[in-house]
Amino acid sequence: TEDETDDLWNIDAKVEFVASTKDPVKVQMFVPPLNRDYVSLNESFISNNYGVSVNRADGNRKVTWSARRASGNQTLYYRLVLTKRYSNEKTTVKGPTFRDSLAIEGPEKIAAEALMAPIRQHSADVETFVSETIKRVNNLNDDNVKLLLAGDTSPMKKAQIIDLLLSIAHVPMEKVHTIRLVADTPQTPELWLRSFNGNDWLYFNPDTGEQGLPSDRLLWWTGDDNLITVDGGKKANVTFSMNNSEMNAIRLAKLTDEN
């Protein structure tokens, strides 16, 4: 109807770093692939005296800012305006359904196999297998888990052990880095895990094993790499800020069709 409105999100990523005076500068940062749930209405790369290019690789998008010379404190901006994609079309999703096991031996192998037995017993399919694996690895009182984590209980280390256990069962897993769409609240990328079940990607909370990505999460990039890399500079930092506004749904639908 005429009165219906939809959310429009403005996202700013502010990139700050210190350039070294001698070397050319190359800054690479992941930006959202925007291939499923959201559509971009406007995207800008703001800088002074930098060349800009955007590339796609392995399902991700990456912006590269480059300059022959720069010195001192540098600030670059990435700005994105997006909205939910409303489409009845079912896009065909592809993903891996098999993988090779990661190499493991010694006490780690025994610990991993000891964890695998109950995981297999309590699982019926990919979804329950991944969920059960995540729950087991988050049980920090388990001696087998303690041995595999080796004193490092960070989210990335836990994800690494979850990945190892899933590989023994030939179940593929990817790390997913998301941003939460909440107005006027500073955000940092949040780690999720996903696995392909033959039809679709299933998303899992790496702390609880709960399945399903909340609707306010925007997928920013997947894989093991960091959000940003800087050649010819140091102390790189990315700050996210966002706000939302409403727009007439009919007008927004027209804009969405144009993009």
Language-model segments: residues:
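Intrinsically disordered, low-complexity N-terminal segments that are enriched in acidic
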Residues: 1-87, 249-258
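Short hairpin/turn module used for nucleic-acid contact or packing/dimerization
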Residues: 227-259
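A short, structured loop/turn motif at beta-sheet edges
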Residues: 20-23, 69-74, 119-124, 168-170, ...
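Stable alpha-helical elements in mature extracytoplasmic
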Residues: 27, 126-129, 133, 158, ...
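Short, solvent-exposed aromatic-acidic interface loops
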Residues: 33-34, 45-49, 156, 206-212
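Hydrophobic/aromatic-rich core segments of domains that either
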Residues: 160-239
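Acidic low-complexity segments
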Residues: 72-153
